């Protein structure tokens, strides 16, 4: 299979999606299929007064912690416990919980909702603090995710990604929909609906914009979509293909793959569509650019060696130095994505007759397969670098999946009766 044949699936896959029935903004269903090697036992009580709120905050917190694969939920019973209530930490420790969470949800006079909670270490017998979160009714789920992020940070020592968002493409009723959801696939809404395919969504570093390729004018054009306002601008509408947008870490520049000169090459363009400049100079096909976290390098896919492999060049282009090959395990590797700390590379490798998600240590160059599926594509790191979101197939139907970088924890996110593709995991929210 040629490079353009395989990568052409990124352009054509949207037209092959199965129509999704039901609500236009269908929610993703999450199935956790694995857990971490060790799990932290925690009890999260029902929050006081949440029975009268539109969202059961404590339930969302428990679900977040469970799907991370790093926690096991100890039954806290049905009795609500407020953050102001006295807590017998010794009794919770005796029940097997090393941490305990209590809280409350209250509707304020202005119609907003206030979530308060407190986290306890039952082993040391001390409080680990808490937060007060105020939001409109529509923000209650996000408040719950922020509670889970706080717990994750205090007990795991790193940032959680429950309060981040996902983007992906669904086809329903003959229209293509770019949808934005919470990290658990809930609270989904449509950012763009079109009768033509939408592919390759990419989040801006500040999480307020998504770049993507739309075929609404019967050809691929790169747009930037401002999510709060819905305003769009054209970034690249060159002759031929305009594809694979990737943001620089400072949000000022995008790398794109264009065929305006013949074979597809990598270009850079300012985020307002000005200042187009060519970065790769050869006669090969160069595509799928991805910036390193420090913005100094660009990883990309090229067939310059005969078969598709992943290369690295200066963000200033090949005029600043020849690109260096990065992948050597396997004869066919595409779709590079660099971890937020710059230490790992996720990519898709052809294994036998299928395509599997791999991760490579960029210091030791050791490559490891993470999945047992054979139709993997479009990897995207979580903002904390602990998980990778990707598209694949289960029982012949397109789904999204997430796997921890150690391969132990796996989640499948699907839409009832249909297929979903083109995932991108958003950054930490500002």
UniProtKB/Swiss-Prot annotation:
Position of the signal peptide: 1-26
Subunit field text: The Tol-Pal system is composed of five core proteins: the inner membrane proteins TolA, TolQ and TolR, the periplasmic protein TolB and the outer membrane protein Pal. They form a network linking the inner and outer membranes and the peptidoglycan layer.
Protein name, as recorded: Tol-Pal system protein TolB
Record keywords, A-Z: Cell cycle, Cell division, Periplasm, Signal
NCBIfam families found in the cross-reference section: propeller_TolB
Protein's cellular compartments: Periplasm
Main location: periplasm
Protein source organism: Paraburkholderia xenovorans (strain LB400)
Gene Ontology BP annotations: cell division; protein import
Family per record: Belongs to the TolB family.
Its job: Part of the Tol-Pal system, which plays a role in outer membrane invagination during cell division and is important for maintaining outer membrane integrity.
Source domain of life: Bacteria
GO cellular component, one term: periplasmic space
Disulfide topology: none
């Amino acid at each position: 299979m040629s490079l353009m044949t395989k990568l052409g699936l990124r352009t054509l896959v949207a037209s092959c999606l199965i129509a999704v029935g039901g609500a236009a903004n269908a929610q993703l269903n999450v199935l956790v299929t694995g857990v971490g090697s060790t799990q932290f036992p925690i009890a999260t009580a029902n929050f006081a007064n949440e029975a009268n709120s539109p969202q059961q905050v404590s339930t969302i917190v428990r679900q977040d912690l469970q799907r991370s694969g790093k926690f096991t939920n100890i039954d806290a019973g049905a009795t609500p416990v407020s953050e102001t209530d006295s807590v017998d930490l010794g009794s919770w420790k005796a029940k097997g919980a090393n941490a305990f969470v209590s809280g409350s949800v209250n509707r304020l006079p202005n119609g907003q909702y206030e979530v308060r909670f407190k986290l306890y270490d039952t082993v040391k017998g001390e409080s680990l603090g808490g937060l007060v979160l105020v939001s409109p009714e529509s923000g209650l789920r996000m408040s719950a995710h922020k509670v889970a992020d706080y717990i994750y940070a205090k007990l795991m020592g790193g940032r959680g990604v429950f309060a981040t968002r996902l983007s992906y493409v669904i086809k329903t009723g003959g229209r293509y929909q770019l949808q934005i959801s919470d990290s658990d696939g809930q609270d989904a809404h449509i950012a763009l609906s079109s009768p033509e395919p939408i592919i390759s969504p990419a989040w801006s570093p500040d999480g307020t914009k998504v770049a993507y390729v739309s075929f609404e004018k019967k050809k691929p054009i790169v747009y930037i979509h401002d999510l709060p306002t819905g305003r769009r601008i054209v970034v690249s509408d060159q002759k031929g293909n305009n594809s694979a947008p990737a943001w620089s870490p400072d949000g000022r520049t995008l790398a794109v793959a264009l065929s305006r000169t013949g074979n597809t090459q990598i270009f850079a363009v300012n985020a307002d569509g000005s200042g187009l400049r060519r970065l790769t100079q050869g006669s090969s096909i160069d595509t799928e650019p991805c910036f390193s976290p420090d913005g100094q390098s660009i990883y990309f896919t090229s067939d310059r060696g005969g078969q598709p492999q992943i290369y690295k060049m200066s963000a200033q282009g090949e005029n600043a130095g020849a690109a260096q090959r990065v992948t050597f395990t396997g004869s066919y590797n595409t779709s590079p994505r660099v971890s937020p700390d710059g230490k790992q590379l996720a990519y898709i490798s052809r294994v036998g007759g299928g395509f599997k998600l791999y991760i490579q240590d960029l210091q030791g160059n050791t490559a490891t397969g993470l999945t047992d599926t054979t139709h993997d594509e479009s990897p995207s790191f979580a903002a904390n670098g602990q998980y990778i979101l990707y598209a694949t197939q289960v029982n012949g139907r397109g789904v999204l999946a997430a796997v921890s970088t150690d391969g132990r924890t796996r989640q499948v996110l699907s839409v009832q009766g249909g297929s979903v593709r083109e995932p991108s995991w958003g950054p930490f929210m500002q």
